[in-house]
Amino acid sequence: MKRGLFVGRFQPVHKGHIKALEFVFDQVDEVIIGIGSAQASHTLKNPFTTGERMEMLIRALDESGLSKKKRYYLIPLPDINFNAIWVPYVESMVPKFEVVFTGNSLVAQLFRERGYKVVVQPMFKKDILSATEIRRRMIEGEPWEDLVPKSVAEYIKEIRGVERIRMLATNLESSEKELQAPIRIPEY
């Protein structure tokens, strides 16, 4: 049995991720999907929580039919910001795997140095199928829904994700004092 690893931040999950995962699912028996920057949320670069990203992946994989095709695992991978030991860290966090799928040259290099087979999966419409571009469109009020699976667009609306991203993008001068005030727990 051959198991592959695919790591992404999925902020949010988009059609390019699903196209890449279709390629990955065709190459191996089981797929480990590592959710990078798992500790990060509520920032412009990482607006969604790990749980929200997992929900997006589950819904998108169900919608695409991939969830019925192969067994997959969703594994949160918090950042360690230490490239030289990142691969052993990932190895300690996920089940055993034989091949890594990536479009990131640093990730490819780090895994090759540790002796892994690395497959550079095709990138699909990278200019527009990019989470950065999707978040930009959300902020600017431009159409973004066609760039993500329908189930993901619906979920982002359910959790008011666009409103969150717009809030994170605003200056918030009028609310600055309120946001900087310490949270006080009422005494009873």
From Swiss-Prot:
SUPFAM superfamilies given in the database record: Nucleotidylyl transferase
A GO molecular-function annotation: nicotinamide-nucleotide adenylyltransferase activity
The EC number(s) this enzyme carries: 2.7.7.1
Keyword rRNA-binding: no
Pfam hit, one: CTP_transf_like
Catalytic activity: beta-nicotinamide D-ribonucleotide + ATP + H(+) = diphosphate + NAD(+)
Primary localization class, coarse: cytoplasm
Pathway entry: Cofactor biosynthesis; NAD(+) biosynthesis; NAD(+) from nicotinamide D-ribonucleotide: step 1/1
Keyword Nucleotide-binding among record annotations: yes
Entries under InterPro entries matching the protein: Cyt_trans-like (IPR004821), NMN_Atrans_arc (IPR006418), Rossmann-like_a/b/a_fold (IPR014729)
Protein name: Nicotinamide-nucleotide adenylyltransferase
